[in-house]
Structure formats: C-alpha cells, structure tokens
Amino acid sequence: MGNLKGVRIAGTGSYVPERIVTNEDLAALGCDSDWIVRRTGILQRRHAEPGQATSDLCYEAALRCLENANVSVDEIDLILVATITPDHPTPSTACHLQRRLGAVAPAMDIGAACAGFMYALVTGAQFVSNGNARNVLVIGADLMSRTVDPEDKKTYPLFGDAAGAALLVPSTQDECQSTECNGSAADSTIQTDGLLAYQLGSEGCGGEMLCIPAGGSRTPITTDGEDSASRYLQMDGRGVFKWAVRVFDESAKDVLRAANVSSDQLSLVVLHQANQRIIDSAVSDLNVPPEKVFVNLDKYGNTSGASIPLALDEAARAGRLKEGDLVLLCGFGAGLAWGTALFRW
C-alpha cells in the first residue's frame, strides 16, 4: 500500500484495429452468439490485421496521447509498455516503440497481463513523484487474438486487440487549501493530486488458472506440432471469476480506507474490462451506482493490458472525467496479479 504525490495524468490516447469481429461473425465459426452476450456482455471486438504487431498499436496510441497532452516526443523521459504479446521475445516492445517514435529515452516492458497497465502506472508515477522524470509515457497494449485458440469456443470470443496510453507529468498541487476539493471543510486535508492510494499484489499459487503453458523456457515450442494446444491461453473461467470479484472487493476497500475516501465520493470506477458479470459483481458490494462504472467491453472485449487505458481515454473523450474527479482503477488477471489505485484526475 502506498501513495504518490506530485503526479498527474496530463493526457490519454488509444488505438484499436479497424477490423470489427461481431458475435455473428463468430457464430459462423460455431460460437454461440447468445451465450457470448449472456455470459460476458461482449457484442464485438477488434482484431489486428496480419502484419500488425503490438508496437504498431502502441505507436498510434502514443501519438494520440502526446497530442492530447501537448507534449513532444523529445520531451519524453521514460517509456513503459505493459504487454504479454510482445513483437518479439527480445528486444522489448518498448524499445521498438522508442525507435519508431524517435524518442531519446529509456524504455522497458512490464509483463503483468491484465494488471500490467496498473503496474506500469505505479512504476511511472514513482519516477515522476521522486523527481527523476517529468514526462513518462505509459502504455498498455495486447494482441490477444494471437493468443487464443479459434477452436476454443468459450475463450476465443472473449478477447480483442487494442492499445491505450497515458502521460504522467508532475503536478504543482500538494494539499487541498480550501473547501473547493470536495465541497466541505472536512476534506481540507485530503491529498488533491496523484495516486492517493494504491495496492499491487500477486497470488502466484493461482497462476495455472490463467496461463499459456508453452512458448517459454519451461516448455519451448517444438516443431512437431504436438504442443499446439499449449501455445494458446488456457483459463479456468469459474475460478478466475471468483478470484477477481474477491480481490477487487478487498483491494478497493483497502485503497479507499488508506485514502480516507468513501465509495460515494468516487466520480468514476474503471475496472479491467474482462466480463460484464465480473464488473457487476465486483462493484455491487461497494454500493457504486451503475452510472459511475465505465464499461466499453461490449465494443472491444477483453483487451488485457490495454483495457484500462482504453477505457480511461474513452471516458475522458466522452466528458466523463473532469479536473478533481476521484477515479478508482483496478486491473486483475494472469499471475495471478492485481493492481488497484485511487487517482485524482
């Protein structure tokens, strides 16, 4: 648990591939479109074209983010890319992006799957908060359509491809000096910028619930094709559902308690867009009304590390976020790993 002062999100950006894959398209492959909607809330998703790689999506999202923040490539001090679908095992996708942008900045990948953007966000915020960087470009991006088996009718429909970006910069605010923060004098001691509270966690004992068994040093991919099924994402859907709901409930309450903020003070809740049933179940115990919960998984499906920044960018462009808003973010997924943070916009 921690908090980081002196940092804010100056801009966001996102990119999704042009190709839309609807539930009706998947029905032609043998998937049950009614089941998809009923069990997940997903209506369509985006798939990258052959030849498109993760860094290509990152590049487009980065350009839009920098433009939105009115920051030039030359001003970037650090690039962080959260992904589990890198262009290559090495070099990192962040280095591919750094080269293409023409930036002169260190760059590295962070691999925490659906929680990856939260890990990258907190990491980047550390650099800004302690004065070691002024402009940190944080990106979450995944081409999940390349990791799922088209023959797996229960898993293949869940995922899509996307990239989302946020630019972290220093903030000049420290403490609330008037009643303008939240409308009462009692709020005058609440930190008014940055990550008011965050929690990163992992439960590696549950790693097998959500994994790609082959392709690493433990189980290298062979040329005989015998390990073909192990190349794809394997998921214990029921187990992940129960774990995700529990870990969000616990971590969200911990974070709100640490920040001395109640759930009714929240302006917006942005969870990892995995499944509508998970989102509904997770927020119900917080007593957060549906209108304060941002959802776009119906359009994009589960985009893994891109999920939260994609949602943040859409929320910002839709006018759902204004200066001073309290935003609760939570990502959870393979590892098992999670990251929850309370951010003042």
UniProtKB/Swiss-Prot annotation:
Enzyme class, first EC level, given as a word: transferase
Record keywords, A-Z: Acyltransferase, Cytoplasm, Fatty acid biosynthesis, Fatty acid metabolism, Lipid biosynthesis, Lipid metabolism, Multifunctional enzyme, Transferase
Biochemical pathway: Lipid metabolism; fatty acid biosynthesis
Organism domain of life: Bacteria
A Pfam family the protein falls into: ACP_syn_III
Any one GO cellular component localisation term in the record: cytoplasm
InterPro entries attached to this UniProt entry: ACP_syn_III_C, ACP_syn_III_N, FabH, Thiolase-like
Transmembrane segments: none
Record-annotated active site: 114, 272, 302
Major location (coarse): cytoplasm
Keyword flag Cytoplasm: yes
Localization per record: Cytoplasm
Region (ACP-binding): 273-277
GO molecular function, one term: 3-oxoacyl-[acyl-carrier-protein] synthase activity
Catalytic reaction annotation: malonyl-[ACP] + acetyl-CoA + H(+) = 3-oxobutanoyl-[ACP] + CO2 + CoA
Enzyme Commission number(s): 2.3.1.180
GO process terms (BP): fatty acid biosynthetic process
Gene3D superfamilies linked to this entry: 3.40.47.10
Protein family: Belongs to the thiolase-like superfamily. FabH family.
Subunit: Homodimer.
Function in brief: Catalyzes the condensation reaction of fatty acid synthesis by the addition to an acyl acceptor of two carbons from malonyl-ACP. Catalyzes the first condensation reaction which initiates fatty acid synthesis and may therefore play a role in governing the total rate of fatty acid production. Possesses both acetoacetyl-ACP synthase and acetyl transacylase activities. Its substrate specificity determines the biosynthesis of branched-chain and/or straight-chain of fatty acids.
Comment text on domains: The last Arg residue of the ACP-binding site is essential for the weak association between ACP/AcpP and FabH.
Protein name, entry field: Beta-ketoacyl-[acyl-carrier-protein] synthase III
